[in-house]
């Protein structure tokens, strides 16, 4: 959560900043633009530390010139406008932000202000605090009435948020009901995308040629704002809860008791929270967390220190934007200088040229960094990167190494501008770059690098799943000329395979058996294996369900492909162009000649389940998306929550609160076998 936390004016006298009204208004406009990018578009344009610097300057100007301050100043407000794509919901108690401090000295100044607010001497140091991590995610508020969850909403502007109930309920560990509670209850927490899930998503997106997430916070915000909660579910969001708004009848007196009560009710809470007394203990906690930040499963950009006593919190009160009894102590942005030793350019299966920076190894946030992605030619040119340059590197979002800038005063006198390849580094073919496209491609389908990557993808587990055909074998097959593309795999003989290095008759027989078995894989696997840009497992399954047979897909128009749920124009154009390409048509023809007969999908009747509403829960043997698409293609509606209007609950292993809710309402519950029987009965 950038939070958004607002920077304190501590340690920045107003005299140090320009004091013209014109500058003030320009600064306000710039911060408002960044707020829209961050809150409403989930597309921040600058790092958090740069944003914090701008807000510190604005607040210093407003402190020096209170006559300039308007009620809607970004230094006086919280968050951004709720999205019009979701229903607005008003928080019973406002979700305020936090002030920031950046040093022990600023922390001491903040405590002095707190003491004055409580009519205590400024040097009072007997406060007991609870320390927590400041997770870089998306704040949410869960509202319960008489123990039953009514809605979940984002922070929004602090007063009004976006209702995201079904999306939030895809997150593990969120209770639908809290037995025994009466009155109103608000539970606040942070939704996040773990570093591991962020890396896995980007690796998959890069493989499919899709846009990458900039950082885990963007990933969490984008996933939570998906209109379809089943899409949210596939992003594997998590949440940690840390505070209460209204809390009728909840017997808590301290923040420590709040965290303990939340854990008792089943809410996920952080294991990094601690309670301590005094300023030195607070600073020590912050230093310990700073040292451990590389080990967290999520991104965190600081610690939060809260007065432990809820009574003292109420007495200290809040400003219009932040409580006086809590503060965010930001982690330092860890940047290191290193040397750009070289730039290599790799070629992917689509022919895309991907430049990679090789750096002198340096330790950043607990791990050694020696490489950084350079994205494309424009990225290199905009930074004016040159071999031998000293560059500043940070981990973007705490995960991906990123070159931020060049230290020009350390540039070697003989450093020359980097020239992006005009010819493919693998095959020597002249490269191409379409107008308006940031990426450069090798158009040669016979490029060895592309051949290797296409074959590796074809046999991978998510495609044709040919076990035993790994990278080393593919390299040998290409080097010996036995194979040039996927169709050639199905002409290999036992003798040819046995003659290869580290092979033999037994291994050859196993590989041939695997290849034979792959000839009758489901249609979606073949579609995925063809390596069409923007088509991975999910989209391949959607295409297979929509068209049923390979011939039907090959005959499909761009308009009919675009009509497939979840695809859209860009993917439809990519699929149409790929299937119309003569080399792709030749590959498919030769695959069929060599025995590939993918198992066809049976197209269901479009109205067989019309009027029925289904909910899926628990662990199922097939992907939820696959089951959902099959139901919807037959006219059913699939939702994320059980209501009186639900026709059937489909329950897998470890079904939780949805199963309990269905039983309470008398909703029919089917296991997968029962669903299969229903579909067979309806002709689906």
From Swiss-Prot:
EC number(s) on file: 6.5.1.2
Gene3D superfamilies linked: 5' to 3' exonuclease, C-terminal subdomain, 6.20.10.30, BRCT domain, DNA ligase/mRNA capping enzyme, Helix hairpin bin, Nucleic acid-binding proteins
Function comment: DNA ligase that catalyzes the formation of phosphodiester linkages between 5'-phosphoryl and 3'-hydroxyl groups in double-stranded DNA using NAD as a coenzyme and as the energy source for the reaction. It is essential for DNA replication and repair of damaged DNA.
Cofactor: Mg(2+); Mn(2+)
PANTHER family referenced in this protein's UniProt entry, alphabetically: CHROMOSOME TRANSMISSION FIDELITY FACTOR 18 (PTHR23389), DNA LIGASE (PTHR23389:SF9)
Name listed for the protein in its UniProt record: DNA ligase
Family the UniProt entry places it in: Belongs to the NAD-dependent DNA ligase family. LigA subfamily.
Binding residues annotated for Zn(2+), in chain numbering: 424, 427, 442, 447
Molecular function terms from GO: DNA binding; DNA ligase (NAD+) activity; metal ion binding
Annotated InterPro entries: BRCT_dom (IPR001357), BRCT_dom_sf (IPR036420), DisA/LigA_HHH (IPR041663), DNA_ligase (IPR001679), DNAligase_adenylation (IPR013839), DNAligase_N (IPR013840), Hlx-hairpin-Hlx_DNA-bd_motif (IPR003583), NA-bd_OB-fold (IPR012340)
Keyword presence, Ion transport: no
One GO BP: DNA replication
GO cellular component labels: cytosol
Active site: 134 (n6-amp-lysine intermediate)
Enzyme class per UniProt: ligase
Protein residues bound to NAD(+): 48-52, 97-98, 132, 155, 190, 306, 330
């Amino acid at each position: 959560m950038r939070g958004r936390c607002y920077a304190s004016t501590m340690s920045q006298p107003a005299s140090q900043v320009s004091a013209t009204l014109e500058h003030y208004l320009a600064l306000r406009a710039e911060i408002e633009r960044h707020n829209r990018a961050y809150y409403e578009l989930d597309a921040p344009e600058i790092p958090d530390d740069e944003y914090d610097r701008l807000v510190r300057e604005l607040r210093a100007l407003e402190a020096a010139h209170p006559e300039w301050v308007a009620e809607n100043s970004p230094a006086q407000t919280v968050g951004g406008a709720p999205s019009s794509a979701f229903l607005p919901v008003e928080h019973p108690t406002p979700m305020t932000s936090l002030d920031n401090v950046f040093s022990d000295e600023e922390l001491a100044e903040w405590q002095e202000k707190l003491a004055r607010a409580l009519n205590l001497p400024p040097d009072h140091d007997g406060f007991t605090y609870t320390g927590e991590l400041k997770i870089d995610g998306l704040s949410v508020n869960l509202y319960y009435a008489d123990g039953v969850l009514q809605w979940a909403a984002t922070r929004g502007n602090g007063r009004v948020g976006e209702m995201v109930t079904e999306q939030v309920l895809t997150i593990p560990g969120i209770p639908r009901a809290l037995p025994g509670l009466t009155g109103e209850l608000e539970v606040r927490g942070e939704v996040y995308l773990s570093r591991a899930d962020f890396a896995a998503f980007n690796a998959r997106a890069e493989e499919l040629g899709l846009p990458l997430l900039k950082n885990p916070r963007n990933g969490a915000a984008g996933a939570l704002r998906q209109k379809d909660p089943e899409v949210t579910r596939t992003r594997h969001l998590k949440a940690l809860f840390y505070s209460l708004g209204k809390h009728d009848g909840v017997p808590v007196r301290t923040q420590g008791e709040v965290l303990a009560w939340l854990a008792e009710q089943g809410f996920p809470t952080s294991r990094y929270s601690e309670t301590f007394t005094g300023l030195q203990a607070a600073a020590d906690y912050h230093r310990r967390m700073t040292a451990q930040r590389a080990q967290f499963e999520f991104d965190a950009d600081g610690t939060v220190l809260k007065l432990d006593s809820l009574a003292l919190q109420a007495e200290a009160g809040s400003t219009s934007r932040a409580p006086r009894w809590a503060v965010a102590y930001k982690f330092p942005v860890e940047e290191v200088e290193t040397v750009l030793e070289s730039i290599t350019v790799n070629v992917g299966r689509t022919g895309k040229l991907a430049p990679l920076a090789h750096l002198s190894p340096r330790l950043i946030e607990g791990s050694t960094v020696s490489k950084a992605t350079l994205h494309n030619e424009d990225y290199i040119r905009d930074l004016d990167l040159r071999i031998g340059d000293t560059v500043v590197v940070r981990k973007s979002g705490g995960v991906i190494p990123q070159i931020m800038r060049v230290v020009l005063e350390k540039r070697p006198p003989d450093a020359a501008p980097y020239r992006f390849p005009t010819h493919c580094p693998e095959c020597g073919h002249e490269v191409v770059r379409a107008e308006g496209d940031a990426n450069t491609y090798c158009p040669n389908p016979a490029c060895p690098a592309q051949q290797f990557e296409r074959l590796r993808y074809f046999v991978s587990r998510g495609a044709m799943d040919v076990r035993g055909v790994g990278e080393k074998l593919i390299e040998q097959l290409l080097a010996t000329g036995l194979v040039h593309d996927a169709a050639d795999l199905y002409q290999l003989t036992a003798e040819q395979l046995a003659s290869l290095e580290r092979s033999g008759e037994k291994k050859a027989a196993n590989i041939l058996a695997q290849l034979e078995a792959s000839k009758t894989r489901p249609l979606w696997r073949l579609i995925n294996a063809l390596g069409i840009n923007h088509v991975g497992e999910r989209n391949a399954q959607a295409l297979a369900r929509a068209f049923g047979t390979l011939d039907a897909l090959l005959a499909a128009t761009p308009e009919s492909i675009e009509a497939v749920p979840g695809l859209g124009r860009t993917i439809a154009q990519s699929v149409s162009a790929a299937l119309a390409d003569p080399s792709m048509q030749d590959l498919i023809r030769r695959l069929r000649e060599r025995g590939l007969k993918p198992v066809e999908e049976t197209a269901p009747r479009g109205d067989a389940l019309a009027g029925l509403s289904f909910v899926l829960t628990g662990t199922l043997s097939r992907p939820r998306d696959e089951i959902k698409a099959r139901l919807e293609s037959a006219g059913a509606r699939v939702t994320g929550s059980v209501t009186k209007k639900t026709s059937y609950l489909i329950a897998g292993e470890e079904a939780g609160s949805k199963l309990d809710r269905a039983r309470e309402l008398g909703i029919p519950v089917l296991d997968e076998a029962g669903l299969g029987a229903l579909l067979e009965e309806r002709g689906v």
